């Protein structure tokens, strides 16, 4: 099934430049309302520095496009009741396609980040053909969750994929020839043969970081290093309340951080953090002790009793995260390290506590200490994050850092 967009906002963008002052101020207002949940016109004018008249014109325009809705009037203050404006969940939608090393996800979210529909499929390793088959079957299922009128408000497809997915073949347990097919795979071209919508591609953990920034981050950290524990560990960076992707879109790739170590001959060498603090390492450890490891990939809520092997892995992960945190803090003065992953909440909390302990015992001379907190999106962060890409591109002040990737 081919989905074609009839979204009025997409048509509007084709007719006028989105780089003008009006579009910039629209993004500022949408971002502000997203951050605060809702806000009246007077508060928006105060926080943006725009005139009351300019705010009124923009708010009225966004309301006419069904992107904003009026909330109940706030009474009890001097003067007339104020009317807060909030994002309209039905105002726009994004589809996310997450390409994982062990699974595929297809997710539909609305403008405020609610998951309207989601599909998941496990795999031993990702192949080009299995992805296209999954997408073609799944896209029609997602569309069924919306009325024909709302389906016109789907703004695009965000794709989250591991950086250089064809590398680390031994660690991924996949044939090199199969993974090499991804080198020449053009996501935009192939997906557009199935879905006639704009396609945006980014790193999987950058996508997860964007989900935390847009729909989580309850402590309102302005600058934080985001860490996602998946099949391979990875991360993202937020600076000045903005997703920082770097020139080539791979900022925060902590999985590739080399950790000094001694080899069997006592010589100094290094090992990437991927090989210490990733889920596939736990899988190897459990298999070595005779455990069935299917639960790691089939459930993100509860793993049952995995005994001392899990405890050893948690300690190993925390050791790596504390090292990564110190290295990152030496380069940029982050407020916090935010840890999430495709793992049960109780396991994540143990990792956070263990990381805090190891950091507290580390040598911080010349480096400021930071908060260490759990992420708030969970195992679906990558999926929600890539579905959020079309929304960010259209409505967020972060759009410039994403659109060129």
Write out the residue ranges for each language-model feature.
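Short helix-capping/turn signature of helix-turn-helix
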Residues: 35-36, 215, 230
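Conserved phosphate-binding catalytic cores of ATP/NTP-utilizing and phosphoryl-transfer enzymes
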Residues: 70-94, 199-224
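Short glycine-aspartate micro-motif
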Residues: 94-98, 154-158, 224-228, 234-236
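Short acidic-glycine loop/turn motifs at beta-strand connectors
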Residues: 110-112, 167, 239-240, 261
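Glycine-rich phosphate-binding loop and adjoining helix at the ATP-binding site
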Residues: 115, 119-223, 350-360
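Glycine-rich phosphate-binding loop of actin/hexokinase-like ATP-binding domains
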Residues: 220-276
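Short, active-site-adjacent cap segments at secondary-structure transitions
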Residues: 164-167, 207-209, 234-235, 244, ...
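ATP-binding/phosphotransfer module of carbohydrate and carboxylate kinases, centering on a glycine-rich
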Residues: 1-71, 77-120, 126-152, 262-405
């Amino acid at each position: 099934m081919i989905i074609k967009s009839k979204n009025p906002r997409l048509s509007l963008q084709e007719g006028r430049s989105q780089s003008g002052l009006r579009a910039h101020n629209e993004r500022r207002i949408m971002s502000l309302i997203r951050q605060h949940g809702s806000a009246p016109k007077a508060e928006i004018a105060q926080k943006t520095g725009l005139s009351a008249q300019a705010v009124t014109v923009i708010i009225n325009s966004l309301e006419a496009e069904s992107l904003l809705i009026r909330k109940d009037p706030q009474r009890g203050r001097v003067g007339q009741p104020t009317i807060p404006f909030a994002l309209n969940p039905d105002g726009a939608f994004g589809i996310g396609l997450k390409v994982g090393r062990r699974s595929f996800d297809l997710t539909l979210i609305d403008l405020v980040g609610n998951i309207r529909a989601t599909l998941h499929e496990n795999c031993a390793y990702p192949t080009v053909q299995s992805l296209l088959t999954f997408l073609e079957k799944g896209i029609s299922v997602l569309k069924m969750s919306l009325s024909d009128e709302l389906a016109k408000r789907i703004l695009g497809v965000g794709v989250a994929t591991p950086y250089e997915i064809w590398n680390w073949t031994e660690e991924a347990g996949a044939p090199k020839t199969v993974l090499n097919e991804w080198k020449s795979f053009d996501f935009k071209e192939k997906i557009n043969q199935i879905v006639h919508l704009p396609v945006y591609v980014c790193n999987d953990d950058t996508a997860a970081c964007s989900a935390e920034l847009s729909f989580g981050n309850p402590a309102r950290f302005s600058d934080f290093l985001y860490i996602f524990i998946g099949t391979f560990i990875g991360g993202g960076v937020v600076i000045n309340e903005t997703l920082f992707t770097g020139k080539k879109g791979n900022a925060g790739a902590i999985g590739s951080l080399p950790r000094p170590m001694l080899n069997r001959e006592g010589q100094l060498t290094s090992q990437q953090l991927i090989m210490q603090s990733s889920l596939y390492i736990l899988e190897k450890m459990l298999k070595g002790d005779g455990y069935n490891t299917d639960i790691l990939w089939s459930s993100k809520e509860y793993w049952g009793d995995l005994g001392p092997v899990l405890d050893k892995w948690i300690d190993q992960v925390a050791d790596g995260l504390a090292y990564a945190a110190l290295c990152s803090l030496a380069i940029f003065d982050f407020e916090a390290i935010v840890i999430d992953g495709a793992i049960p909440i109780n396991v994540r909390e143990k990792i956070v506590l263990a990381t805090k302990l190891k950091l507290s015992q580390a040598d911080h001379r010349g480096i400021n200490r930071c908060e260490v907190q759990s992420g708030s999106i969970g195992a679906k962060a990558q999926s929600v994050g890539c579905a959020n890409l079309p929304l960010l591109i259209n409505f967020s002040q972060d759009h410039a850092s994403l659109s060129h990737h």
